[in-house]
Amino acid sequence: MINIDMTGEKRPLDLPYPSSFAPISAPRNQTFTYMGKFSIDPQYPGASCYPEGIINIVSAGILQGVTPPASTTASSSVTSASPNPLATGPLGVCTMSQTQPELDHLYSPPPPPPPYSGCTGDLYQDPSAFLSPPTTSTSSLAYQPPPSYPSPKPAMDPGLIPMIPDYPGFFPSPCQRDPHGAAGPDRKPFPCPLDSLRVPPPLTPLSTIRNFTLGGPSAGVTGPGASGGSEGPRLTGSGSAAVTTSPYNPHHLPLRPILRPRKYPNRPSKTPVHERPYPCPAEGCDRRFSRSDELTRHIRIHTGHKPFQCRICMRNFSRSDHLTTHIRTHTGEKPFACDYCGRKFARSDERKRHTKIHLRQKERKSSAPSSSASAQPSASGPGGSQAGGSLCSNSTIGGPLACTSRTRTP
């Protein structure tokens, strides 16, 4: 802080004042006292845009009077500007209040601050208040705030991933959903050609199963001992075009004959005929079943209905156990292990077929020692090697060798 006192008598001081800060002319017999306070403020802690070395006039006062400065005269009360940019405005102009009315016309009022919406709960201030250069109260520079850019639209949450449903019949397909409303002019909707492949096959109608369950026993068998009579609905026509005309099949599903005949067509069943009241309605098929679900599963052979679909390769199956074993080909699960070698299989019939190999090998090993043991007693019999052989003796007369053969008679 530097205090400068300048007193002069009967002559004005030749000080370079700006045009807006010119001193007031006074009579020759008055004594003027000029007092100025100049301070060099450091950089504001809250604002990093003010460069160092800038002299900021915090306050300036002109005391006028005949009495010395120590006397109590009317002086101007100066209020320092707050470092808050909201109080100083966007241009950082210091505000001063004067008590003398004759000094009001020397100072131009500072420009009004921009209307801040502090009551509306805005959390961010105008960036132009921090980017503007500091100026004094005597001069103001025209400063244009930087252009404002529209804020970008919030991006979609990356966690919201559209899921493709397993059955598009129950859920809308992803190509029909538009999260942003109507598509743009350059965007064309995807035709979704694969939707037809993902549609599951139609299931067996519940009415068909109910009719076979409730109407089969009454139509096929009338009593516990009745084995003849009508055996349920039959087909009319021939070949694959044959359809049922009975009320047990309201949807008239075509029942195709089995192209590959059974290996044992006349194989007797363990269950008596009167305990199998559900005959197959297909013409030329003599199968009968004791349970309605067995008949429903058998009818799928004639109709070709495959209601069980693999969700990995979209292959269809007529039986659920076939689908279960098929899924193991994708997952690599092999729950059936061989009891002899520990080899694992995905199907029980494969393990059963493999076990037969070990059983045949075991039979061969057990039969080999018994055959070798039975061959030894036959070789070591009475007579030894002479049995079945020829007896040769030398003649004492010097004649030729006389050989007589002797064979064993049974």
Swiss-Prot record:
Family to which this protein belongs: Belongs to the EGR C2H2-type zinc-finger protein family.
GO MF entries: chromatin binding; DNA-binding transcription factor activity; DNA-binding transcription factor activity, RNA polymerase II-specific; RNA polymerase II cis-regulatory region sequence-specific DNA binding; sequence-specific DNA binding; transcription cis-regulatory region binding; transferase activity; zinc ion binding
Any matching Pfam family: zf-C2H2
Gene name of this polypeptide: EGR2
UniProt biased composition (Low complexity): 68-83, 127-143, 367-380
Transmembrane parts of this sequence: none
Subcellular location: Nucleus
Protein name: E3 SUMO-protein ligase EGR2
PANTHER family: E3 SUMO-PROTEIN LIGASE EGR2, KRUEPPEL-LIKE TRANSCRIPTION FACTOR
Motif HCFC1-binding-motif (HBM) boundaries: 104-107
